[in-house]
C-alpha cells in the first residue's frame, strides 16, 4: 500500500458515511494525484461543508496544506487553527511540544506513527497545530504519520461507540437504528437508480420504504415492527442491480 493510499484510508475512516464522504474521497484522490492545485479554493470548500466536526475539518485542512503546493506567504486558516489547538488545554500543548521534538528526529512515516500512537488525541491535534502554524517543521512523511495516528485514535473511539449502539439491548434504540438504516438505504437506492429507464421500480421501492418509516415515526409503532426492514430493502436493491448487470454483494 502506498503512503498516500494509507493516508487516504485513515482520513476517510473518520468521515461519516454519505454523499459528502464520496465527495471528500474524490477531492483527496485529486489532491494526491496533483490534479487540484488551488489550495485557497479547496480550503474555502472544506470550511463550508456541513456535518463534519471541527476536528475532522482541521485534519483535512492540514492534509490539503501539506499536499497542495502553495505560495509561501499564503494565510493560515482560522477554522483549522481553532480545531488543532487541543481544546486550549495547556497539558495538551506541553505533550504536543514533547511529541514534536521526537517527530523532528524521525524521518519515516511508520516510525512517526508508532511514536504518535502513545499520545492522546488532544496532544496529537495540538502537535498538528504547531506544524500547521509553522512553529515547527517535520518531514512530510512524519506529518502524515502523525495524521494517521490521530485518525486511528478517533476511529477507535467511534468504533467503540458504534459497537455499543449495535449491541444495545434497548429495543427503542434498536428500533430507531433500524429505521434510520432503512431510510439511508432508501436514499442510496434513489441516488443509484439515476435516470435509467429501469430505475422507476427501484425509485418506487425506495419511496415506499421512506414513506413507511415516516408513518412509523409519526404514529409510533411497536419496537419489533421495524425488524427486517433494512434487509428487505437491500434484497430489493440487489435484485435491481442484478437486472442492471451490477454486482455489489458487499452491501450488507
From Swiss-Prot:
The UniProt annotation puts motif Nuclear localization signal at 101-105
Biological processes per GO annotation: viral budding from plasma membrane
Name the segments for region: RNP-binding. 165-252
Subcellular localization(s) per the UniProt record: Virion membrane; Host nucleus
Could you state a single Gene Ontology molecular function term? RNA binding
A single GO cellular-component term from the record reads: host cell nucleus
Which residue stretches belong to region Membrane-binding?
1-164
UniProt cross-references to InterPro entries, sorted A to Z: Flu_matrix_M1 (IPR036039), Flu_matrix_M1_C (IPR013188), Flu_matrix_M1_N (IPR001561), Flu_matrix_M1_N_sub1 (IPR015423), Flu_matrix_M1_N_sub2 (IPR015799), INFV_M1 (IPR037533)
- Signal peptide range in chain numbering: none
Please provide the record's keywords in A-Z order. Answer: Host nucleus, Membrane, RNA-binding, Viral matrix protein, Virion
Q: Which Pfam families match?
A: Flu_M1 (PF00598), Flu_M1_C (PF08289)
Topology versus the membrane, per the UniProt entry? Peripheral membrane protein
Quaternary structure per UniProt? Homodimer and homomultimer. Interacts with NEP. Binds ribonucleocapsid by both interacting with genomic RNA and NP protein. May interact with HA and NA. Cannot bind NP without genomic RNA.
The record's misc note reads: Most abundant protein in virion. When expressed alone can form virus-like particles in transfected cells.
Q: What does this protein do?
A: Plays critical roles in virus replication, from virus entry and uncoating to assembly and budding of the virus particle. M1 binding to ribonucleocapsids (RNPs) in nucleus seems to inhibit viral transcription. Interaction of viral NEP with M1-RNP is thought to promote nuclear export of the complex, which is targeted to the virion assembly site at the apical plasma membrane in polarized epithelial cells. Interactions with NA and HA may bring M1, a non-raft-associated protein, into lipid rafts. Forms a continuous shell on the inner side of the lipid bilayer in virion, where it binds the RNP.
Family named by the database record? Belongs to the influenza viruses Matrix protein M1 family.
What is the protein name for this chain? Matrix protein 1
**Native source organism of the sequence:** Influenza A virus (strain A/India/6263/1980 H1N1)
Task: Tell me the classification of the organism that encodes this protein.
Answer: Viruses, Riboviria, Orthornavirae, Negarnaviricota, Polyploviricotina
